[in-house]
Structures are given as C-alpha cells and as structure tokens.
Amino acid sequence: SSTCIPSGQPCPYNENCCSQSCTYKENENGNTVKRCD
C-alpha cells in the first residue's frame, strides 16, 4: 500500500515517484537533493 511521491518532492529511488524518475536537483541553498521529476 505504497503511495507514489509527487513531482518536486524528495525521493530515495525512481520507483518511489509517480513519474518513476528521481533525479538530483539543486535547491535554493545550492545543495543537491534527489527529487521526483
């Protein structure tokens, strides 16, 4: 009963995302965080 993570939210793996794609993005602080595409 796992729900998918919406676009723009932090994610551990591709499979966790509704889009099935979790990639590194740079946030406003200049830190790199994996988020759903």
UniProtKB/Swiss-Prot annotation:
Entry keyword annotation includes Ion transport: no
Keywords from the named record: Calcium channel impairing toxin, Disulfide bond, Ion channel impairing toxin, Knottin, Neurotoxin, Secreted, Toxin, Voltage-gated calcium channel impairing toxin
GO cellular component, one term: extracellular region
One Pfam family in the UniProt entry: Omega-toxin
Tissue specificity remark: Expressed by the venom gland.
Compartments reported by the entry: Secreted
Biological processes, Gene Ontology terms: defense response
GO molecular function, one term: calcium channel inhibitor activity
Disulfide feature: C4-C18, C11-C22, C17-C36
General function of this protein: Inhibits insect, but not mammalian, voltage-gated calcium channels (Cav).
Protein known as: Omega-hexatoxin-Hv1b
